[in-house]
Amino acid sequence: AVNESDCIEVDGESVVYAKYEYYVMNKPQGVITATEDSRQDTVLDLMEENRRKDLFPVGRLDKDTVGLLLITNDGDLNHRLLSPKKHVDKEYVAKISGRVTEEDVKTFAKGIFIEDGFRALPAELKILSYREKATEEDLLDVEQSNAPQKHLSQGITEISIVIHEGKYHQVKKMFHAIGKEVFFLKRIRMGTLLLDEELAEGTYRKLTADELSGLMRITCKEK
């Protein structure tokens, strides 16, 4: 069972050993989503040194992508969340160089070809705001990303997008396919799990019982 616990003794004191642990992290820019790397800092390097050694991130966020990341040692849940058969929602907010149009919204809703004949599943794209001139924060975001700056003169659109699969660089490739570039990307939801806005970037906490049961509920459904 997922909540199975064993009572063990450490230095003569009884402690509860949980079989599985679940954490939500607000991933910052500049760290990679991996368990270990000899050259770059990983998301697990942000956790306490006495953490369990069998923890791993569920899925991956690019080095310059921020936001919600689930970390656990539950391989079954990891498999179900990432299974193409489950189509678990992933929601992002992003800044796009160039004007995103209602025509783009319709294109994404139909499913867009992004590379090598691969067609992404229909995605829900919403335009949140548009501004003609980049702010200092925008310029900093561009500097910290690998996105080209050629479209900044065409304004900046802030959007939200829900995708139902998790291909490599998928959101960035979807916008690139319509001639626009993502220069800031933040994941705010995975299935029923929402990013805790009280979590500062680079910090984490354990999932609540309600958060965990929500993930179990959506991934245990047959699809």
List where the protein language model places each region:
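Basic, flexible Lys/Arg- and Gly-enriched helix-loop patches that mediate nucleic-acid binding at interfaces
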Residues: 1-223
